[in-house]
């Protein structure tokens, strides 16, 4: 059976991996998943990530914990294949009053809501992370 929403699967793997106190998780790789992992890493929600090349490239994400608790409190998919959510630059949401981030896919690539606001860009809201 084919996967309907690979991004939701990625977010679920991160959520489940941290709930099970895993050190690292792996999943099939794609350009969008690597871009999302890059945003999560630069914002400090995951330790690191790497793409393991092979016949089918795998994305390996090293999860981050603080005092034995997951750094990611919640991670939730917003825009999905059946209902895409797009926002203009002035409509971009602030997650937890600015404490969390919204991952946004813009014409200039995948970035946080903060970076999109500074660049005056709107786009598709991929997920919220807090």
Swiss-Prot record:
One GO CC annotation, please?
ribonucleoprotein complex
The keyword NAD appears for this protein: no
A single BP term in Gene Ontology: translation
The domain of life is Bacteria
- Sorted alphabetically, which keywords does the UniProt record give? Ribonucleoprotein, Ribosomal protein, RNA-binding, rRNA-binding
Gene Ontology MF terms: rRNA binding; structural constituent of ribosome
Q: Which InterPro entries match?
A: Ribosomal_uS8, Ribosomal_uS8_CS, Ribosomal_uS8_sf
Annotated family: Belongs to the universal ribosomal protein uS8 family.
Q: What does this protein do?
A: One of the primary rRNA binding proteins, it binds directly to 16S rRNA central domain where it helps coordinate assembly of the platform of the 30S subunit.
Alphabetized PANTHER family for the sequence: 40S RIBOSOMAL PROTEIN S15A
Q: How does it assemble?
A: Part of the 30S ribosomal subunit. Contacts proteins S5 and S12.
State the name under which the record lists this protein.
Small ribosomal subunit protein uS8
Native source organism of the sequence: Glaesserella parasuis serovar 5 (strain SH0165) (Haemophilus parasuis)
